[in-house]
Amino acid sequence: FFAGTYFPPEDRGGMPGFTKVLLSVSDAFKNRRDEVKSVSESVVDRIQQINLRKFSDTSNGDMKIDALVNAKNELIKEFDWNYGGTGSAPKFPQPMIYEFLLRRNFYNSEAQVHEALIKTLDSMMRGGIYDQLRGGFHRYSTDMFWLIPHFEKMLYDNALLAKLYLNAYQMFQKTEYSEVVIQILDYVRDE
């Protein structure tokens, strides 16, 4: 019944502060619970309708497969074969892109995609973007080598990267990937 991505500590620039948001959500839940439940159910129903329509459309199946192949090919063209990932500096982890490639590789194994994934995952976990002492990934690397981190860690990045490394561990059976997952989750729990 309520969503957002960032709330400043105090009211600022027309945005409510985090404390005000929490108090408003608490008030709505306590005093307008039926309305909250109704809105929540409406949102869930709408999402389910969209997903059913989106994923049950079997027409143009070849076109959808072609789009996936084209997306994979374009991503591989942009790949940094020396240091992993795409582009140069600053270099951001792209867990959703790597997850897409991982799934593509699961269903249609290709040596080039396999190599790109391993290069990227290994470079990130061995670089300075990964906090070797406390676990968790920094937001991005200020250089193209994944060595110099921008010293900020985001929960959503670490959640996506934990999922990515878990799926990569299941596919490639590299013990280091499972260790990264555990360290990320420990970091998130402790911080």
For the regions a protein language model found, what residue spans apply to each?
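Replace the tail clause
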Residues: 1-191
